[in-house]
Amino acid sequence: MKNMMNRKQLWVIVLIAATAMGVALFAVGAKSAPAQQAGVLLSGAVKSDTGAKLEGVTVSAKAEGQTITTSVFTDEDGNYYFPRMAGGKYLVWAQAEGFDAGKSDVSLSGTSGRQDFTLNTLKDSQDIVKQMTGQEYVTALPEDTPQRRKMKDVFYNTCTGCHEPSYILQNRFDEPGWEAILNLMSRVYNGGGEYAGPDMAPFPVMAYYKKELATYLAEARGPGASTMQIKLRPRPRGEAARAIVTEYAVPIADPDANPNDDGFPTNDGTFWSMGTPSALNGSRGLHDTQADHNGNIWFTTSEPNYKRTVSMLDTKTGKVTDIKVPGLNGLAAPTHGLAIDPAGVLWATMIGDPRGGGGNLLRVDPATMKYD
């Protein structure tokens, strides 16, 4: 969600929430939205432990037992305003890079409620970097000498095509540790992520620069003092801070085969201090999204699983309905690209159809949930 903050569009945009296993909608800002009579208006103020008003802080609210999270941003005076919400119990939290998150259980009733936050400044740089985006990690990597600049380019061009830089750099290893990782990754199939075994010829660029790159990474993300120069991105302000973000938590396709929290990923990116989520807890596979003519969100799943080929997310309730197209060996056939035609029919590219072929086209009618 942090990567969305500087977007200035105030109308609805549909996208996958980058590192957070979910789907998000941007909507009109709270101050420009038409007045609503029903529901409770939650507002408050956010300041630092020094008393400074904090602009651009992300404040989020999630109703108890629900899967929908709504987030707004503080204005130039440190104040925030949610659109009116249903009464009930909520978890409300405020986050800004460089600060501990503030969390509170809030019961909303009547016409309005208030929750203020005081955020404590983080003193340890190791705590700060856990909150950083991939872009911020790459920016922080040193390039003050020709050798370091070259190694930064090698890292960016070689190690960030399939996963976020933050997923790699949130960890710290000494030089032998980084070299061991490079030895492994040099024999991993690009794109698929499968280890090809020791007999596969290593990726030439990684093999050639392995020792130099291991030295560079150990200096930046090793056990000793770091060469990184941390510079956090400015928080949103002005029009960008008037956006409202709605996130929908998507359950794991196969929760029995993965660590989970009541069927959801144990870390979905909600709390930045937990670091970048890992696909190892099942939070991967969502690929393309499309909004249908009823305002619901459809998405494809590209990773092998037993129940999900394409899915519909009800944007009013957050409920996810899965459609399984039989694939190979009892699995659901994976899907990749997704488009919608003028008639509202969805089309997806499908892999692993038992009928054979390298790929097939899947058609889904959102009105009937039938496919062919």
Locations of the language-model features?
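Short Pro-Gly-centered beta-turn/loop motif in secreted/extracellular proteins
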Residues: 52-55, 81-89, 97
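Residue-level detector of Asp-centered blade-edge/turn motifs that repeat once per structural unit
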Residues: 291-294, 340-343
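Conserved beta-propeller blade signature
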Residues: 296-299, 345-348
